[in-house]
């Protein structure tokens, strides 16, 4: 199960992305306010959208099960996890993030740690951070 939970603008900028895109709903007026998706992003287009939405409106977490998706070794999320961070860091920099913040630190440390961990352990760790 995806480790979804409440988040906000500040936590998103720290890299706490706990929003499963399959179950994300938002108002059409918010989409008109912040949309569309930025086509320059391939891996972090949803992260960019969540940050822009959180900047103009509170995000509300509902703990009900709204959707399912399959997470396996061939998904972009897992197979190219290291390629998402450079795009997330572009969003972070655009929002005024500092080079010594939590997200840049995670971006540097995660490839070193995750290279040695099996998939199930990586998924378990993801729930903790």
Predicted segments with their positions:
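Conserved nucleotide-sugar donor-binding catalytic segment
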Residues: 1-87, 91
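Membrane-proximal basic amphipathic "stem/tether" segments
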Residues: 93-129
């Amino acid at each position: 199960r995806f480790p979804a939970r409440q988040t906000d603008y500040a936590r998103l900028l720290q890299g706490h992305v706990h929003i499963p895109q399959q179950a994300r709903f938002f108002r059409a007026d918010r989409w008109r306010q912040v949309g569309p998706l930025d086509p320059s992003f391939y891996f972090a287009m949803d992260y960019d959208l969540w940050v822009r939405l959180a900047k103009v409106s509170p995000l509300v977490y509902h703990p009900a099960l709204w959707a399912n998706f399959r997470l396996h070794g061939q998904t972009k999320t897992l197979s190219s996890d290291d390629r998402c961070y450079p795009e997330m860091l572009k969003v972070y920099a655009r929002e005024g993030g500092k080079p010594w913040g939590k997200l840049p630190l995670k971006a540097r440390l995660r490839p070193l740690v995750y290279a040695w961990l099996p998939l199930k352990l990586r998924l378990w760790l993801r729930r903790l951070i």
